[in-house]
């Protein structure tokens, strides 16, 4: 006869009808009883021949692939001009007393952050943008490239200019060794070189003169080719021109894919550049020099675009032009869907490349990428904006994987001990928190992203395209890329991006200037940074509480008026050091804080309502008597495990599911087991804050008996059969709780102290979790345990009762200073110029 739900509840001692605990509870440790119950509940994981169920509600399992959905209307989020101040430590010391060693150590970790993996694999640029959406290849390419350019303009990325140089926007840090302008400019004046000639897009450095070192040249001259005006006007090559010609004709094009001109300019170069770069042309004293405007630190740098040296000579030999996009301009349309129709829409398509405001020297950076990128929805609640996903998983795989540092994550009890109070709360939203932390330029070659340019990208992902590497840029295969799909996509994208289509069609290689989200080091660094900042805030306002986990930052104060003043002071401090807050997303919670998926109040902690609704929907759609794929069970356990501490039986109730996942077998929910779990999760109990106190109840056990010391009273008992020592100790703790009602119990068993009952017999673990719920344990050595003698049958001997205090722990998550003692008077308004008379003493 199958085990009914009511009988199962009585078996677990969850009803008040159970007999004496000392008789009933040891039975639950019996191995035969556990096997019989598991068999009655169909928990034995049989090899069923019925097909497995691979989908339950929103949970999918094996052999099910979620087709990603591309949104053609995705918006690229805007990023503020984030620049964390380099004198962060000094500003913190001005805000509060001298920083502690812990605070200084944590802040130095991120000023700047460093990342040096054991080995780095480099991939071709063709793999820079992942073909995540095969039906929307072109749209995805341009939206991803636009996202990358947005990050570069927002000071988050470096742009690779050459093998040893990069450019970026925004204010430089001291560790970013800037390459200065040379002493010669186009007008022959010495100074900043506002008209200095840069070497097209690559930014390759000119060779230093004889007698100087490479290092000194890097410090003295800015990127670019430095010629005198006379040499340019006469079209002659001086000594520097010969050096440039010999050194800077690379076998591999600087930008990684497309050839760009680095030769000397003459009339042919003038005609080719004026034909292909119809952006704002600036002609100085030399009328034969045609340039297009770039972006440098002065805003007036000149970009020289010429044909490769091999083509300079006679026009009869033909020219291999550097810009794939603009080659269509002077060709005959091949069809109604020829790309030349789009290119002829505009006279001025803008520059082929953009340069940053500053140029720096970098370690050797190949024209490759180390991780692919693609776009997804920003979050399940915001599908209008996109989020860039960067795949740097190579650093977490293989024999050369990086061992990421571990950091403290607050568990539920520590979080409740710390935040469960009668304070008023608010939470702050840090804009793009990861992108606040600067990365040392030496890490750039390990964190490269980019794209190979539209022509090569379309050729790789399209089976109909016939662009081959050795033919790239030749007129014979130019029109092979023309197709109806590409034509229609570009025509629609033209309405969004306009002439930027030309810029985005070129290859680009970018390295991270701020820490990326796709590397395991980033969460550690962000946690260290925010915890140090909160520690500074706590010491500046000892009467308040500031706490953070990753980018979630919360502030608490005794009254709403006080919280408003605290909010103003803290936000001003954070803004003064360069931390950007999204004030529109500041949430005022009142006395019930919403944090990390929990609701935390003075009464304790409960899961948030949206999680409770997910659990209800899960049980509503959970089938019975059908084998469910273990991968689906894994997802179900992930949801139920979050709320397990708030149920009667806790994690032990989920142990049959854990066993099926470990064995990679299907699991069949019997009606009784489903009803048991459903009842468990429909009635959630808050996890209460632990209170300090004095331990006056002690428990101890041997394999054959148990003993208790409750005040000056001693008790003992024996087991029917010898039990494992850990099981006996757990039973003794349950007896102590049942007989005394004390919420602080002393024991000498480390397993009982850990409060992890999943390794005990299943039925005993479920019952013990409910009996010991809300109980705090204190470790007492066996030699000093007053219950040691009773457990061995010696009631006549009474050891003196220990005065063993219990202090609630917050683990390694709290780094605040104790507040000074204060009277109970509470002023109506807080003035930060004088000490506050009302303080909250943390636990």
UniProtKB/Swiss-Prot annotation:
Region (Disordered): 249-301
Residue numbers spanned by region Polymerase/reverse transcriptase domain (RT): 347-690
Reaction(s) catalysed by this chain's protein: DNA(n) + a 2'-deoxyribonucleoside 5'-triphosphate = DNA(n+1) + diphosphate; Endonucleolytic cleavage to 5'-phosphomonoester
UniProt record, GO biological process: DNA replication; symbiont-mediated suppression of host innate immune response
EC number, UniProt record: 2.7.7.7, 2.7.7.49, 3.1.26.4
Region (Spacer): 178-346
Polar residues compositional bias, start-end: 262-276, 286-299
UniProt keyword terms in alphabetical order: DNA replication, DNA-binding, DNA-directed DNA polymerase, Endonuclease, Host-virus interaction, Hydrolase, Inhibition of host innate immune response by virus, Inhibition of host RLR pathway by virus, Magnesium, Metal-binding, Multifunctional enzyme, Nuclease, Nucleotidyltransferase, RNA-directed DNA polymerase, Transferase, Viral immunoevasion
GO molecular function, one term: DNA-directed DNA polymerase activity
Presence of the UniProt keyword Flavoprotein in the record: no
UniProt family annotation: Belongs to the hepadnaviridae P protein family.
Note: Hepadnaviral virions contain probably just one P protein molecule per particle.
Domain note: Terminal protein domain (TP) is hepadnavirus-specific. Spacer domain is highly variable and separates the TP and RT domains. Polymerase/reverse-transcriptase domain (RT) and ribonuclease H domain (RH) are similar to retrovirus reverse transcriptase/RNase H.
Function: Multifunctional enzyme that converts the viral RNA genome into dsDNA in viral cytoplasmic capsids. This enzyme displays a DNA polymerase activity that can copy either DNA or RNA templates, and a ribonuclease H (RNase H) activity that cleaves the RNA strand of RNA-DNA heteroduplexes in a partially processive 3'- to 5'-endonucleasic mode. Neo-synthesized pregenomic RNA (pgRNA) are encapsidated together with the P protein, and reverse-transcribed inside the nucleocapsid.
The protein's name: Protein P
Annotated source species: Hepatitis B virus genotype H subtype adw4 (isolate Nicaragua/1853Nic/1997)
């Amino acid at each position: 006869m199958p085990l009914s739900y009511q009988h199962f509840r009585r078996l677990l001692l969850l009803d008040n009808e159970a007999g004496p605990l000392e008789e009933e509870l040891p039975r639950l440790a019996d191995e035969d009883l556990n096997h019989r119950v598991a068999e009655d509940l169909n928990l034995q994981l049989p090899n069923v021949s019925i097909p497995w169920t691979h989908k339950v509600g929103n949970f999918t399992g094996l052999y099910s692939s979620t087709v990603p959905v591309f949104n053609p209307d995705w918006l690229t989020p805007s990023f503020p001009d984030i620049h964390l101040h380099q004198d962060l430590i000094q500003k913190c010391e001005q805000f509060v007393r001298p920083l502690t060693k812990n605070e200084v150590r944590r802040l130095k970790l991120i000023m700047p952050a460093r990342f040096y993996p054991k080995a780095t694999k480099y991939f071709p640029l063709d793999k820079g943008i992942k073909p995540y959406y095969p039906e929307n290849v072109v749209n995805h390419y341009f939206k991803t490239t636009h996202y990358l350019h947005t990050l570069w303009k927002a000071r988050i990325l470096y742009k690779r200019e050459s093998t040893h140089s990069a450019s970026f926007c925004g204010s430089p840090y001291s560790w970013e060794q800037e390459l200065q302008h040379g002493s010669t400019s186009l007008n022959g004046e010495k100074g900043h070189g506002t008209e200095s000639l840069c070497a097209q897009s690559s930014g390759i450095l000119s060779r230093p003169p004889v007698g100087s070192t490479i290092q000194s040249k890097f410090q003295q001259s800015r990127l670019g080719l430095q010629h005198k005006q006379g040499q340019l006007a006469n079209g002659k090559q001086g000594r520097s021109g010969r050096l440039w010609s010999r050194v800077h004709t690379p076998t591999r094009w600087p930008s990684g894919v497309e050839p760009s001109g680095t030769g000397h300019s003459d009339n042919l170069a003038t005609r080719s550049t004026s034909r292909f770069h119809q952006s704002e042309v600036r002609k100085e004293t030399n009328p034969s020099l045609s340039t297009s405007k770039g972006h440098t630190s002065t805003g007036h740098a000149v970009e020289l675009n010429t044909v490769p040296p091999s083509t300079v000579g006679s026009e009869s030999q033909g020219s291999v032009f550097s810009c794939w996009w603009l080659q269509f301009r002077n060709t005959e349309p091949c069809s109604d869907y020829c790309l030349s129709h789009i290119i002829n829409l505009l006279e001025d398509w803008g520059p082929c490349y953009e340069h940053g405001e500053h140029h720096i020297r970098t370690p050797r950076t190949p024209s490759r990428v180390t991780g692919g990128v693609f776009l997804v929805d920003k979050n399940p609640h915001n599908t209008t904006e996109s989020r860039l996903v960067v795949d740097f998983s190579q650093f977490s795989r293989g024999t050369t994987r990086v061992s990421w540092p571990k950091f403290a994550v607050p568990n539920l009890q520590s979080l409740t001990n710390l935040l469960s109070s009668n304070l008023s709360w608010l939470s702050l939203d840090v804009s793009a928190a990861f992108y606040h932390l600067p990365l040392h330029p030496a890490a750039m070659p390990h964190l490269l992203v980019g794209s190979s340019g539209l022509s090569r990208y379309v050729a790789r992902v399209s089976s109909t395209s016939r662009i081959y590497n050795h033919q790239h840029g030749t007129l014979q295969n130019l029109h092979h890329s023309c197709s109806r799909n590409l034509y229609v996509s570009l025509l629609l994208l033209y309405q969004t991006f306009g002439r930027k289509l030309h810029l985005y069609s070129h290859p680009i290689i970018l390295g991270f200037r701020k820490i990326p989200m796709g590397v395991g080091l980033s969460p550690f660094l962000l946690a260290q940074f925010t915890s140090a900042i909160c520690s500074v805030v706590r010491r500046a306002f000892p009467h308040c509480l500031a706490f953070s986990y990753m980018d979630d930052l919360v502030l608490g104060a005794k009254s709403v008026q006080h919280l408003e003043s605290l909010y103003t002071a803290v936000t001003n401090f954070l803004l003064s050091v360069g931390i950007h807050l999204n004030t529109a997303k500041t949430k005022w919670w009142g006395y019930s804080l919403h944090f990390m998926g929990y609701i935390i109040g003075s009464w304790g902690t409960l899961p948030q309502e949206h999680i409770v609704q997910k659990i209800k929907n899960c049980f509503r759609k959970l089938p019975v008597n059908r084998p469910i794929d273990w991968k689906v069970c894994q997802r179900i356990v992930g949801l139920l495990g979050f709320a397990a501490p708030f149920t009667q039986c806790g994690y032990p109730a989920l142990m049959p599911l854990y066993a099926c996942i470990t064995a990679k077998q299907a699991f069949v929910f019997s009606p009784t087991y489903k009803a048991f779990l459903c009842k468990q999760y429909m009635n959630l109990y808050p996890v209460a804050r632990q209170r300090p106190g004095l331990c006056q109840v002690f428990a101890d056990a041997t394999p054959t008996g148990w003993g208790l010391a409750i005040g000056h009273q001693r008790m003992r008992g024996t087991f029917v059969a010898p039990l494992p020592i850990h099981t006996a100790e757990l039973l003794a703790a349950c007896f102590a709780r049942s007989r005394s009602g004390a919420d602080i119990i002393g024991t000498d068993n480390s397993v009982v102290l850990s409060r992890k009952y999943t390794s005990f017999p299943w039925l005993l673990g479920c019952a013990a979790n409910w009996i010991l719920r809300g109980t705090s344990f204190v470790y007492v050595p066996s030699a000093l345990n007053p219950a040691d003698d009773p457990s061995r049958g010696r009631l006549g001997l009474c050891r003196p009762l220990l005065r063993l205090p219990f202090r609630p722990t917050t683990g390694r998550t709290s780094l605040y200073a104790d507040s000074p003692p204060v009277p109970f008077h509470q002023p109506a308004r807080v003035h930060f110029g004088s000490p506050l008379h009302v303080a909250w003493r943390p636990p």
